[in-house]
Amino acid sequence: MAFPEYSPAASAATFADLQIHPRVLRAIGDVGYESPTAIQAATIPALMAGSDVVGLAQTGTGKTAAFAIPMLSKIDITSKVPQALVLVPTRELALQVAEAFGRYGAYLSQLNVLPIYGGSSYAVQLAGLRRGAQVVVGTPGRMIDHLERATLDLSRVDFLVLDEADEMLTMGFADDVERILSETPEYKQVALFSATMPPAIRKLSAKYLHDPFEVTCKAKTAVAENISQSYIQVARKMDALTRVLEVEPFEAMIVFVRTKQATEEIAEKLRARGFSAAAISGDVPQAQRERTITALRDGDIDILVATDVAARGLDVERISHVLNYDIPHDTESYVHRIGRTGRAGRSGAALIFVSPRELHLLKAIEKATRQTLTEAQLPTVEDVNTQRVAKFADSITNALGGPGIELFRRLVEEYEREHDVPMADIAAALAVQCRGGEAFLMAPDPPLSRRNRDQRRDRPQRPKRRPDLTTYRVAVGKRHKIGPGAIVGAIANEGGLHRSDFGQIRIGPDFSLVELPAKLPRATLKKLAQTRISGVLIDLRPYRPPDAARRHNGGKPRRKHVG
């Protein structure tokens, strides 16, 4: 079908022009939003006017605010039944969207927003539903579970959003989405957002949306070319941060974290390690925030530990580095963060600490910014110790030309004559005294095992089976038109797993094999056994190869096969 195009030609210059709820307007001002993005300027008026909307938008365009702001402006917060339903493909996105609703609705005192996703306690979700939630954000699989348990009532839903619809269909949730839509009232306002518009999405839109406006908005590469971007895979973040600060030359740095509590905790640890650091968050009074920013600008402090909200609008030219201690869950925050460096035409550097389980977030940032992040290596112990020795030598050189040297030279010479101790020993003792008993050099990392040292470069590396994984059987295969993405999506959402928890996946004609953590909790196994993909019960269970079964029964082994 052909969609009418919504033109943003007369789009508002500010959020105040969009006639949104005054309390919502106040909240987005607190968040730091000043003017709407292209998709917000086009979508918010259409949704406020009651139209259905199809948004062709990638991550990083501001689409969450584009649908959350008008929904919050129109719901009845005195009614505790679900009025707004948002369907998303992953638990991470469910949490992200729910948090956004909470921020934009901060001044709607009776507002309750409930995220529903696999891997989370049913008891917590049931309590939230009994308490009453006007906004429910969730993944299709867990939504279906609640519908079948009759614990989720969608009969009074006025607003429905399908976010990242193409991802949901790719992950095999098409039937679940249709089932959920069938439980909602016929007359409701629907918004569908998708990065692409394949035939399946067009068909879904034609079936459930009425004369929708189509808004097309591509994410801009809002990252300046003068900012270098890289990431480091780390296990112990505080140790990694210390190494980077000791080795990387920087003028001033912002360290971004997710929580207010983390700002002060990390700043305190940095001060204890000899760095000039301060913290700002949304809880810091404005006067104190201004004093801290002035100290950063004047060079009285060099490291600022901050949350996203606290750093909005920060413009200090001497910030040469931005370090994402906690990787942001949305690309808008990432682009804003690294925009704090590279000001006034200066070059800047942005670094992300990432764990293996967070690599999918890294890929989302690359996709949205259309820039490849380079992997950097964590400074080694040798790198750190080389810098410490060099700085120690510099401190001696600086002290030799400083005031008061004559007095201490006389005292040291007297000590040398009276105790007959070499001058070098006296200097070493004074250096130890200055350290306060603290080790000067960083202890070496434990040596790599022989197995890790043996790279076997004389032949191609084959994928090695991870010892922490075991093979499970799922009762869906090629004849069910199921791909690896659908299996990963369903199991990750319902089992509370991350993509890094998966090993090899082999699709057979009638069933498939998937490698998962060997020590899955019994409750998780039970839940996954009842999970459905495209309506088919996957009946997940540990896999026992036919040859192993025959050997166990005294028979001859047979060739291993799948499906």
Swiss-Prot record:
Biased composition (Basic and acidic residues): 451-461
UniProt feature, compositional bias: Basic residues: 551-563
Spans annotated as Disordered: 441-470, 543-563
Stored SMART domains: DEXDc, HELICc
CDD domains on file: DEADc, SF2_C_DEAD
Taxon lineage: Bacteria, Bacillati, Actinomycetota, Actinomycetes, Mycobacteriales
SUPFAM superfamilies registered for this protein in UniProt: P-loop containing nucleoside triphosphate hydrolases
Protein's recorded name: ATP-dependent RNA helicase DeaD
Motif (DEAD box): 163-166
Species the sequence originates in: Mycobacterium tuberculosis (strain ATCC 25618 / H37Rv)
